Amino acid sequence: MDVEHHKSGHISRPTVDIPPRKLLSSAKSPSSVSSPLRDYKEQKDYCYDSDSEDPYAGDHFRMYEFKIRRCTRSRSHDWTDCPFSHPGEKARRRDPRRFHYTGEVCPEFSRHGDCSRGDECGFAHGVFECWLHPSRYRTEACKDGKHCKRKVCFFAHSPRQLRVLPPSPENHISGGCGGSPSSSPASVLSNKNNRCCLFCSHSPTSTLLNLSRSPSSSPPLSPADKADAFSRLSRRRTAVLNELISSLDSLSLTEALAASSSSPVTMPISTATMIASSNLSSNHHHHRLPPWLDVGDRDLQLQQSSPLRFALSPSSTPSYLHGQLQPPPSSFFGDEFTPRGGRLSDFSVAAAAAAQARDKNSFEVGSSGDLDLGWVNDLLT
């Protein structure tokens, strides 16, 4: 440092000499040059957070720009340290805003390392497309927490970094205009099934009543509706019973015999009854049983004591009916044989003839074995 003395006696300020070499080196020092790529390289030793000031560590960049935007650098550099995509790089991703695919791994790509459908595939190709997809990125917590040393971590390291997806699949993912997973083929199919199940579950008779995803505004079957349903059933049962009783009241003896003759269980006894009644009505002037009907004492006593035993057993046939059954006359089902046609006296005559026949045979059956046709008259009057 040189000190100059003026003629007046005053001392001037000291002059400091600095070599030009140091000025040039300080101006061109790497610490004075600031660039995003340099900051990215300096911060590669620790995991990036959304809380940091690095623009390459934000959620939006990671989901929609990382390994998607083309790198513009002309010099050769390490692709693993660059956040942009390069030609032929395996970590290259498809833009989820342009290509609609889900966060599920493509089975064909995982087996063979390539997919025949290419960019049109509806599934993720590779780890970066799978875990950086808007439907999966930072939706789970990192097992290492704040001590994570990964360059690019797909998981959250704090509660503030944890991304909570909207509950409705039809809403778009925050940060992208077309990054909704609901537009993929698989999700569209699942949404259609969900809507179908939702519509079907609103039906009162549906088995999917308890499988509805969204609760309905009102219960599917209120107590008032249950009471109405039971009242409708009660009214229906009463109407059926009334109809059955009226049909039984209007049923004549001939119609009952005709209906019972078609059943294999009651065929023998009903056919014998029809034949006997037809012959008795045609010969009521003679007041005698037909000569071809041979009724023994024992068989008649068994028939009068238990008339339902033969009707309820399909294998048991009275002895007097073996080989003696004949088809009823063609006019048996005519109007002249219906009790409503005015031939009620035929039944009285037949009853009187049967009583006289029992008297002629001179056997005692007892009070319980007498033929009582009074209930027939009660039904017909």
Swiss-Prot record:
It holds the Pfam family zf-CCCH. It comes from the Eukaryota. GO terms for cellular component: cytoplasmic stress granule; P-body. Residues 21-37 have a biased composition (Low complexity). Gene3D superfamilies: 3.30.1370.210. Interacts with MARD1/FLZ9 and RD21A via its CCCH zing finger domains. This is Zinc finger CCCH domain-containing protein 61.
